[in-house]
Design a protein with these regions (language model features):
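A short helix-coil junction within the Rossmann-fold of NAD(P)-dependent oxidoreductases
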Residues: 7-16
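Active-site loop immediately N-terminal to the catalytic Tyr-X3-Lys motif
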Residues: 30-36
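Active-site-adjacent segment of SDR/Rossmann-fold oxidoreductases
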Residues: 11, 30, 51-63
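Residue(s) in the substrate-gating loop at a strand-loop-helix junction
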Residues: 25
């Protein structure tokens, strides 16, 4: 990320206006169990983008830096991820593929159950760039999790971790 941006930045600065858009994740705003390595990378994207944005502003550059925090967007990210194993009762399976017996089924469910589509995400990003909002949340889930993590920083993670299990419990009884 850093190398690409240092290569492209001089070219972007020659334009009347330009934008650098880095994609983090809602897991770049808070962490959950079993996602520590992923969160480290996404928190890093957030920190890098915030620092870059300030540097560009201080140098009076015409380039703006934005950080996107998508929630659950219907993509193939889950089905293309590499897992050591997939267990139906595993927490990741409960979150991403609630009723799946295989990783492939979980990937399909993940995509189908997404509250946001890639097309919707693109529209939200463009709308926020036009408004000069540097921090862009994608999806109602991202807004909800962001708000809840701010309001209830200690209990939020416990609530989030148990929600999929409760949802599965009620689905199986109906």
């Amino acid at each position: 990320m850093y190398k690409r941006q240092t290569v492209f930045l001089p070219h972007l600065e020659k334009r009347p206006e330009a934008a650098i858009i880095n994609t983090s994740s809602i897991f770049g705003l808070f962490s959950v169990p079993k996602q520590s390595i992923y969160s480290v990378g996404k928190f890093g994207v957030k920190a890098f983008t915030e620092s870059l944005s300030l540097e560009l502003e201080m140098s009076e550059s015409n380039v703006e830096a934005y950080c996107v925090f998508p929630g659950h967007v219907g993509t193939n990210i889950y089905s293309s991820a590499k897992f050591k194993s997939f267990e139906k009762d595993d927490a990741d399976a409960a979150i991403f593929g609630a009723n799946a017996d295989t990783k492939e089924q979980a990937g399909i469910q993940f995509k189908q159950n997404a509250p946001s589509s890639p097309k919707h995400a693109a529209k939200v990003i463009l709308k926020n760039i036009r408004k000069k909002n540097k921090r862009i949340l994608i999806g109602i889930d991202a807004h909800f999790y962001d708000l809840m993590s701010r309001l209830f920083p200690k209990s939020f993670l416990k609530i989030i971790w148990i929600l999929p299990f409760l949802r599965n419990l009620f689905k199986s009884k109906n």
